[in-house]
C-alpha cells in the first residue's frame, strides 16, 4: 500500500540521532568564506568554509548538512542495533526482530551463497505463464510483494472529505521514475537510458541468460516502459491537486477500466470491499490496459521477470547488489562507491522497523527541554504569520479571516508520537533469506494500513515520519505541521542557542512548513483539510500573479550550463522558503523587543539570522545528482534556496548593505511580495 505524500522540507528523508556540532551563542566563522562577497554569492559567504571542509566522498552523490547528521548518527544506531543483533533475544520480541533483520542484511557470506535462489520460485511462476489471464494474476500477485508493474494502490485521506480515508490508484512501473528520462534528447539523459539498458541486460545475464537474449530482453523492457511513460503525468503535472483527483465508485472503476482484473488485485492484496476510489492518473491506467491487451505474452513475461529482478537485486548477492548500484546510484546520481554493508543494514532496519528504533532513539537522544523550547518557537512563529497575513494589502478582509481560521486550526506535532506502531504481527525468521523476510515486512505493512485505513476515518494522531527523521512536513488534509526529533538538533536547533541563530535555522523551517498551508497547493485546502476554495476571486487572481513572479524568477536561474531550474516544479517549495524567511524574521524582531540581542562575533542579530539560514543549505553535489534533482525534485538545489530566496527579502539587503551594484540585487518592484 502506498502511503500518504506530504509537503516536506527536503525531498529525501534521512534518519539520524544527536549531532556533535555546537552552535554555541553565535556564528562559527570557520563555516564561512569571509573572502566571498555576500552580495555576489551569499551561499559561498555563509557556507563556503563548511563546503570546503566536507568534500564529497566516493559513496555520496550529495553531501549536505542533512547527510552530515546521518553520518554522525549511524555510529550511535550501529551500536544500538549491533548490541541487539548479538543478543539471543526471545523469538517474537522487538529486540529479536531488529537484531535478526540486521544480521540478515549484513550476512554477506550467506547472501552470496544463496545468490538469487530466494527469487527462483517467483521467476519460475512467471516463466510458466501461458495466457493473458495468467499475466493479470501475476501483476496482482507482484503487488502483494511490493512490486508495482503498471499501477500502485494506496489508501489515504479523501481530498474533498478529509475525515475519511479513500482508496487510491496511482500510475506506477517506470524504473527511472520520471517520464522525461524516456523522451529527453540531451546527452546526459541519453546516457542514463543507455545505462538502464545495460543494467537490465546484466540482471538477465546474472540469472544465466546468454548475452544476445539478455540484450534483446533489455530492449523489450525499454520499449515497454517507454510506451507506459507516454501517458504518465510528469513531476509538474503531479503537483496539480485538482487534476489528480478523479473519484469514482468501485463499480465505475470496473466499467471504465475493464482491461485490468481488479477483483483479483483486491482479493490477493487483502483489500475488503469498498465503495469509492480515486484514480489519480487515469490516462496512465488506460495505457496500462492497452499494454496488457496488446503486447505479446512473451514480452509481458520478460517485463514481469525484470520487475522481480530489479526489486530484489539490492537484497541478493554482491553481484546483484553491484548491478543495481551501478545504475541507480552511479549512473543516475553519480556516486562512485556503494555504502558499507553495515550502513545499508541500518538503513533497512530503520526503514522496516522505524518506529521501534524511534522509540529507543527519543528516550536516549531527545531531551524534554527541546520539546518545550520548540513549542514556544512554534507559538511565536504562528503569531508572526498572523501578523504577516494582516500586513498583506492585496488580500481582502474576507480572505484574511479565512486564512486566520486556517492558521489557528493548525495541528502541531513535535518530537515523537504519543502512541507507537505495533509490530507484533511481523515475524522475522532467521531461517528464511533476507529477501523473504523483506517480503514479509512489506506484506505486514500493507496489511497494517489496509486494516487501519480502508473504510476507516483518518487517524489525525498518526505520524507520517519517524522521530529520527531529519525533515519536517505539512500535511494539507489534516492541516498539521510536524517536526520530528531528528531535525531538532544543531545546526537547525539548539534549545539554549542564540535566538538569532535558532530563528534563522529552525525558525525558518517552522515558517516553511506553515507557509505550505498557504502555497500554490496548500492554499487550495481549507482549515479542515478539504480541497475547497476559500479565496475571493480577486484575491485568488492576485495570489497567482504574485507567485508567478517567483516561478519566472527561478526559471531564469542557471543550475548548470544549459540547465535552468524548473520554476513551476519548485514553486511550492520556493514559496515556502520565502514565507519561512519572512515569518521567522518577523518572529525574531518580535522576540528582540523584549529581549534585545547584542552583536556577537562581529555579526548583528539580523546578520546571524541570515547566516544561519545560509549554513543549513551547505552542500556539495555531483552533476548527475543535480541533473536528477532538477528533473524530479520539487525543491530547488541548495545553493538556489539561498541565492535565489534571499534577494526577495528586504531585510537581507539592509543586514548586509546589499546595493544595486551587487550581482544578487533584485529591484524592489521585481521582488516576490507574498506572505
Language model regions located:
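Intrinsically disordered, low-complexity linker/terminal regions across diverse proteins
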Residues: 221, 256-259, 271, 278-282, ...
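Bacterial Sec-dependent N-terminal signal peptides
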Residues: 1-21
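Short, solvent-exposed loop/turn and secondary-structure capping segments
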Residues: 29, 53-57, 153-156, 178-180, ...
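Noncatalytic, helix-rich "gating/capping" subdomain that lines the substrate-entry/channel surface
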Residues: 84-376, 380
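Hydrophobic/aromatic-rich, well-ordered segments within soluble, folded domains that form packed cores
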Residues: 31-52, 182, 186-206, 397, ...
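Active-site-surrounding "flap" and adjacent substrate/cofactor-binding loops of secreted or lumenal enzymes
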Residues: 36-40, 45-109
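Short secondary-structure subsegments characteristic of cysteine-rich extracellular domains
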Residues: 12, 59-81, 212-231, 502-508, ...
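Short, Gly/Pro- and small/polar-rich lid/capping loops
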Residues: 20-30
